[in-house]
A protein has these predicted regions:
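C-terminal motif of bacterial Sec signal peptides marking the signal peptidase cleavage site
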Residues: 13-16
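Bacterial lipoprotein signal-peptidase II cleavage site
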Residues: 18-26
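A short beta-strand motif characteristic of beta-propeller blades
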Residues: 43-48, 87-92, 120-126, 165-171, ...
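Repeated scaffold domains used in trafficking and secretory/extracellular systems
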Residues: 51-58, 98-106, 123-138, 174-186, ...
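Short, conserved, GDST-rich strand-edge loop motifs in beta-rich repeat architectures
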Residues: 55-65, 131-133, 143, 193-216, ...
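Short coil/turn segments that connect the beta-strands within blades of beta-propeller domains
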Residues: 64-66, 143-145, 187-189, 256-258
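Beta-propeller domains
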Residues: 71-117, 148-173, 226-230
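Structural signal for beta-propeller blades
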Residues: 78, 154-157, 200-201, 219, ...
Length: 289
């Protein structure tokens, strides 16, 4: 089908490039109408360009086949994008106030935002969102909830997909940064917040010379109450890891159900001082054998 359409488009485009009047396409032939062919020729579009355009175009009143949840990075929110149109359908406010949609400026949303403040009461009004993830049933996406992490401040947010609004933000009590996102176990019993950089546990200070002894990573398993649509902090737990740097963590499925997988970098425990003989950070080393 694509090949037949492409051939018809090529013929039409060639006619347009030759400045010849193209006849109106007959219904069902796959050829472009004359006015559309003229636009394509004027812009120098190839048959593949035109095919890509018509593959993604969605007229008003037509729904996309899929929706994509994209992290907003240091803007601290989540974008909802239609696929294949790639239109932004909604911006979900999460870790930062957004005056234009009233988030963080009323009692209800302010309470949600303040739930993610620092343990000492310092307000956090920004975030760095990474790796959103959907809730699952039997290892398949069920579209009920979306979870998103704040890499900069080690926080987790719960978004209810009945109304596409943030319902809960939690500050990790022991971690300073995360990256492993907010992946879930096969039936969303737990939301898994993976760590990134090792730090002293409990907000204590330790010099880098004590890195191996005092610095640790933590994988946090947040217990999720699906009925309440909230994380139950009292039933959650953490696993202590060596002070490697973790990237992404996710739960196994099917034959690997019951296992958790997390990839690591900087297993050399590099902290600088290469010129003094300390380990080099292997991720950036190029070896010439």
């Amino acid at each position: 089908m694509k090949r037949r359409l492409s051939l018809a488009l090529v013929a039409t485009l060639l006619a347009g490039c030759g400045q010849q009047a193209a006849p109106t396409a007959a219904p069902g032939t796959g050829a472009l109408p004359a006015d559309a062919a003229a636009v394509a020729a004027e812009r120098g579009l190839t048959a593949d360009d035109v095919y890509a355009a018509v593959s993604t175009y969605q007229p008003s009143g037509h729904m996309d086949d899929y929706i994509l949840f994209s992290s907003g990075g240091q803007a601290g929110q989540v974008f909802v994008i239609g696929v294949p149109s790639m239109r932004i359908l909604r911006t979900i406010a999460v870790f930062a106030p957004e005056p234009w949609q009233g988030y963080g400026f009323g009692d209800e949303t302010t309470e949600v935002l303040r739930g993610g403040d620092m343990p000492d009461g310092t307000e956090l009004n920004w975030g760095d969102t990474h790796h959103p993830n959907l809730s699952e049933t039997n290892g398949e996406y069920d579209g009920e909830f979306l979870f998103i992490n704040d890499k900069a401040n080690a926080r987790l947010a719960v978004i209810d997909l009945r109304d596409f609004e943030t319902k809960q933000i939690i500050k990790n009590p022991n971690s300073l940064s995360d990256h492993g996102g907010s992946f879930v176990t096969p039936n969303t019993e737990y939301v898994v917040e993976g760590p990134q950089y090792a730090t002293p546990i409990g907000w204590e200070y330790a010099p880098v010379e004590e890195y191996n002894d005092k610095y640790r990573d933590l994988i946090t398993f947040w217990k999720f109450d699906r009925v309440a649509g909230r994380v139950d902090e009292g039933q959650s737990f953490q696993i202590e890891l060596p002070p490697y740097w973790q990237d992404l963590c996710d739960a196994g499925k099917s034959v690997s159900d019951g296992w958790m997988f997390c990839n690591s970098i900087n297993t050399e425990l590099a902290t600088g001082g290469v010129e003094d003989g300390n380990p080099m950070f292997g991720c950036s080393v190029i070896v010439n054998p």
